[in-house]
UniProtKB/Swiss-Prot annotation:
EC class of the enzyme, as a word: transferase
Start-end of Polar residues biased regions: 55-64
InterPro entries per record: RNA-dir_pol_NSvirus, RNA_pol_PB1_influenza
Quaternary assembly: Influenza RNA polymerase is composed of three subunits: PB1, PB2 and PA. Interacts (via N-terminus) with PA (via C-terminus). Interacts (via C-terminus) with PB2 (via N-terminus); this interaction is essential for transcription initiation.
GO molecular function: nucleotide binding; RNA binding; RNA-directed RNA polymerase activity
GO process terms (BP): DNA-templated transcription; symbiont-mediated suppression of host gene expression; symbiont-mediated suppression of host mRNA transcription via inhibition of RNA polymerase II activity; viral RNA genome replication; viral transcription
Sequence segments annotated as region (Promoter-binding site): 249-256
Similarity section: Belongs to the influenza viruses polymerase PB1 family.
Biological role: RNA-dependent RNA polymerase which is responsible for replication and transcription of virus RNA segments. The transcription of viral mRNAs occurs by a unique mechanism called cap-snatching. 5' methylated caps of cellular mRNAs are cleaved after 10-13 nucleotides by PA. In turn, these short capped RNAs are used as primers by PB1 for transcription of viral mRNAs. During virus replication, PB1 initiates RNA synthesis and copy vRNA into complementary RNA (cRNA) which in turn serves as a template for the production of more vRNAs.
UniProt source species: Influenza A virus (strain A/Hong Kong/1/1968 H3N2)
Chain intervals for the UniProt region annotation (Disordered): 50-82
Keyword field: Eukaryotic host gene expression shutoff by virus, Eukaryotic host transcription shutoff by virus, Host cytoplasm, Host gene expression shutoff by virus, Host nucleus, Host-virus interaction, Inhibition of host RNA polymerase II by virus, Nucleotide-binding, Nucleotidyltransferase, Phosphoprotein, RNA-directed RNA polymerase, Transferase, Viral RNA replication, Viral transcription
Protein name (database record): RNA-directed RNA polymerase catalytic subunit
Enzymatic reactions: RNA(n) + a ribonucleoside 5'-triphosphate = RNA(n+1) + diphosphate
Length: 757
């Protein structure tokens, strides 16, 4: 979608134009090939930042580990990970002193969550490292595989469906001398294709049992798989991100629940809120500093940037924080929460796919898997790769690298925010005991620092003190990348503040346009995005009207549904013209059927079908909203659907839009090519899982959805629910006697089959 940039500048104050300098139009860069190099960079850098720490060897896995905690105090400005335990604990104590009862209350809230969370919480989330197959899988499949393996190894606590019981199994699994797992393998054979008479390779999937000893199992359980982060704008170099396995995820979830609960109570925390709520929270802190800096005081703000936040954090520090936060709590609770940081202190980073070599002269390509990097002759690699491999070799075990210091990206966002806020908290006058004082905002690794003092020397002293205090807990403020301004102008988490937050509209640009789900959803999402931007992002009426016209144009080109009376020829125009001519009320045709656009900025909240319903010919209504229409594989749609929109910053957001089911709400069929690959068995498992969940949710509409607890299985729950519903429907006259009898018969048959099984 082309937007003429000059139109944007007609009446825009200069500071609002900041957003046009963002690299957010066009396609974002994606990574290709292997992430092995990026992962080695991360591992090597992390060790370099902590190089003066103490080396030890893990007695269970034999992995060499570097511990920088309480290491030497830094003498220069280089980033370092030498956090001092007593400093972290003191910062926690002061945080508690200024917020009485905060840790206590958060622990109570978390304890309640721990006792109620079901294990299916772990099915949320995208790709997950599946330790049974040693590669990434969708979260639900990885969880199912893990539970299946646990069950076949005699671990059954998780049958009750509580997450805490699954975690008990995880702990027990680590004590077992060996584990038996099922892995997939593929056989290839050449067969003649009946149709084309050519030879083709046919792949079949087998499952085989394999025994894993304690050491190998522990390595897998502690492994984080790595991938390259895609679609990152404004960077030349790609970087690696990690995805943990199922053993770690549950423990991390509880730690983050506790930290989230603390963050919600801290006014300086930019997490877990977002959007307008976050802006209001931030504006409060700024207002406080500006009103308190009376005429006698200066107030400056640093737009802060930290050097390699994750790689200088340390799981051992997080353990110290948790130990402090949960003091006086029951032993079991403290144990559950301390496991995540302990596992992270012993984590292993999987190096990914390895390297691809090709010989131009011989037209040969070969994959060097990560497992071989420990032993292969380095003469095949270029200079920089050779250096990386040499450096990482002492750390390698079975294609994974021991990575004790550092936290991989995105694992403990909430807890690290608590650490950051605890340093901001130390800026109160009662702690600094001088004329300067500070406050600020923290959101994961991003921060803004507001310093007040009677003169410039005081400001400088305040900044220096903040900088040095951060160093003591392993936070490295970058002097090169942070900049200071009079309070009133700064940037924080891509929000630009200039006497109030300026809408950074360019961030939303990627979400304008046609999503490509289907005609019905795309129309609805398109107008909802425009509506939301009018509400939240200062999208003015004239620009919104222009955006709407561009969207409709874009939509018509995408689905080739130009108006019935247009001159444009496409492969759909013949059908659409015919429909146009035989329709009495042409205004009633949907845009996707060649109708006119009736949207303007006043009615964006109404789904198109509803907007045009009164204008439609009766037979058109009948065809459009007919669930028995044989040409449509129909998808049942609740009144509200969720679309994934891509804002420019951060992860894809989920956005609600109104969904009215019509014959345009089709679902494209799955690409067949996956059916011939090694993923096929997994795909079938996944579909089975999906079908069961969908069926279950049909019986328990979300309003009355208490998951069955205790011994009853999903099937029993559904059968008993069906009987209750049928009786109510029969007694109220909604179903006939024969239908009631048939339902009862089916229920009995199902129970009979279960008994025979």
């Amino acid at each position: 979608m082309d937007v003429n940039p000059t139109l944007l500048f007609l009446k825009v104050p200069a500071q609002n134009a900041i957003s046009t300098t963002f690299p957010y139009t066009g396609d974002p860069p994606y990574s290709h090939g292997t992430g092995t190099g990026y992962t080695m960079d991360t591992v090597n850098r992390t060790h370099q930042y902590s190089e003066k720490g103490k080396w030890t060897t893990n007695t269970e896995t034999g992995a060499p580990q570097l511990n920088p905690i309480d290491g030497p105090l830094p003498e220069d400005n280089e980033p370092s990970g030498y956090a001092q335990t007593d400093c972290v604990l003191e910062a926690m104590a002061f945080l508690e002193e200024s917020h009485p009862g905060i840790f206590e209350n958060s622990c109570l809230e978390t304890m309640e969550v721990v006792q109620q969370t079901r294990v299916d919480r772990l099915t949320q989330g995208r790709q997950t490292y599946d330790w049974t197959l040693n590669r990434n899988q969708p979260a639900a499949t990885a969880l199912a595989n893990t539970i299946e393996v646990f069950r076949s190894n005699g671990l059954t606590a998780n049958e009750s469906g509580r997450l805490i019981d699954f975690l008990k199994d995880v702990m027990e699994s680590m004590d077992k001398e060996e584990m038996e797992i099922t892995t997939h393998f593929q056989r290839k054979r050449r067969v003649r294709d009946n149709m084309t008479k050519k030879m083709v390779t046919q792949r079949t999937i087998g499952k085989k049992k394999q025994r894993v000893n304690k050491r190998s199992y522990l390595i897998r359980a502690l492994t984080l798989n790595t991938m390259t982060k895609d679609a990152e704008r404004g960077k030349l170099k790609r970087r690696a991100i990690a995805t943990p396995g199922m053993q770690i995820r549950g423990f991390v979830y509880f730690v983050e629940t506790l930290a989230r609960s603390i963050c919600e109570k801290l006014e300086q925390s930019g997490l877990p809120v977002g959007g307008n709520e976050k802006k209001a929270k931030l504006a409060n802190v700024v207002r406080k500093m500006m009103t308190n800096s009376q005429d006698t005081e200066l107030s400056f703000t640093i737009t802060g940037d930290n050097t390699k936040w994750n790689e200088n954090q340390n799981p051992r520090m997080f353990l110290a924080m948790i130990t402090y936060i949960t003091k006086n709590q029951p032993e079991w609770f403290r144990n559950v929460l301390s496991i995540a940081p302990i596992m992270f202190s012993n984590k292993m980073a999987r190096l990914g796919k390895g390297y691809m070599f090709e010989s131009k002269s011989m037209k040969l390509r070969t994959q060097i898997p990560a497992e071989m990097l420990a032993s292969i002759d380095l003469k095949y690699f270029n200079e920089s790769t050779r250096k990386k491999i040499e450096k990482i070799r002492p750390l390698l075990i079975d294609g994974t690298a021991s990575l004790s210091p550092g936290m991989m990206m995105g694992m403990f966002n909430m807890l690290s925010t608590v650490l950051g806020v605890s340093i901001l908290n130390l800026g109160q006058k009662r702690y600094t005991k001088t004329t300067y004082w500070w406050d600020g905002l923290q959101s994961s690794d991003d921060f803004a620092l507001i310093v007040n003092a009677p003169n410039h020397e005081g400001i400088q002293a305040g900044v220096d003190r903040f900088y040095r205090t951060c160093k003591l807990v392993g936070i490295n403020m970058s002097k090169k990348k942070s900049y200071i301004n009079r309070t009133g102008t700064f940037e924080f988490t891509s929000f630009f503040y200039r006497y109030g937050f300026v809408a950074n509209f360019s961030m939303e640009l990627p979400s304008f346009g046609v999503s490509g789900i289907n005609e019905s959803a795309d129309m609805s999402i398109g107008v909802t995005v425009i509506k939301n931007n009018m509400i939240n992002n200062d999208l003015g009426p004239a620009t919104a009207q222009m955006a709407l016209q561009l969207f409709i144009k874009d939509y018509r080109y995408t689905y080739r549904c130009h108006r019935g009376d247009t001159q444009i020829q496409t492969r759909r125009s013949f059908e659409l013209k015919k429909l146009w001519e035989q329709t009495r009320s042409k205004a009633g045709l949907l845009v996707s059927d060649g109708g006119p656009n009736l949207y303007n900025i006043r009615n964006l909240h109404i789904p198109e079908v509803c907007l045009k319903w009164e204008l439609m010919d009766e037979d058109y209504q009948g065809r459009l909203c007919n669930p028995l229409n044989p040409f449509v594989s129909h998808k049942e749609i609740e009144s509200v659907n969720n679309a994934v929109v891509m804002p420019a910053h951060g992860p894809a957001k989920s956005m609600e839009y109104d969904a009215v089911a019509t014959t345009h709400s089709w679902i494209p069929k799955r690409n067949r090519s996956i059916l011939n690959t090694s993923q096929r068995g997994i795909l079938e498992d996944e579909q089975m899982y999906q079908k069961c969940c969908n069926l279950f949710e049909k019986f328990f509409p979300s309003s009355s959805y208490r998951r069955p607890v205790g011994i009853s299985s999903m099937v029993e729950a559904m059968v008993s629910r069906a009987r209750i519903d049928a009786r109510i429907d029969f007694e109220s006259g909604r179903i006939k006697k024969e239908e009631f009898a048939e339902i009862m018969k089916i229920c009995s048959t199902i129970e009979e089959l279960r008994r025979q099984k």
